Amino acid sequence: MDEFYSDNFFDGNAPIGWSERDWFDYLKKSEREISKFASVYSVNRLRGKNLDEIATIAGWPIPKAGDEYFEESDAEFSDEPWTLLNHPVYIITRGLMRCLQEHLGRVIAETQISPALVWDISKTIGETSFFMALGANSTDLSEDLLARCNYKMAAVKLNEIMAKLSEIETPASTQGAERMRRINAIVFDLRQLCLNLAEESAAKPNNL
């Protein structure tokens, strides 16, 4: 196992003193934060809180125009390199996608929808995640109009997901019907997040 964490493997661009093992720990920390966000979202959305409130409770407030959020990110990352893996939009998006995939998997098992539709939905979810990540990365590069384009593309993909979800018959069980309701709520939250971030990107002073 030590060979897998070789300190000499592609470490040329690592922060001073960081080894490959440090980076693996960093990756695991990001995954823990994503899982935490998913749990906080699942509990608090049922209590009627909106995504902005939930993100703040989870320690990952949604960035607003002009925020220096990279200096105020979760305390667990405060002394570590700033990368996409500890970007609030990345953590929030991955957390929401995790919730979406969990509920969708259960609904698919209950309703036995066609493999073609399952593939279409899965592919579009992946494309949405891709555009959301590009949007966050573009913001970090100060390419705000590019970020806006990526967030708008993500919103388009979420519209496609909504259309595909409408093809799924309402599950017979009460639990299945509730999962469908939650799936639609998650997609709505993701879409609203994309639209808000696109608007924030357009509102930045250098784009006026």
Stretch-by-stretch model annotation:
Residues M1-L208:
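Amphipathic alpha-helical assembly/interaction segments
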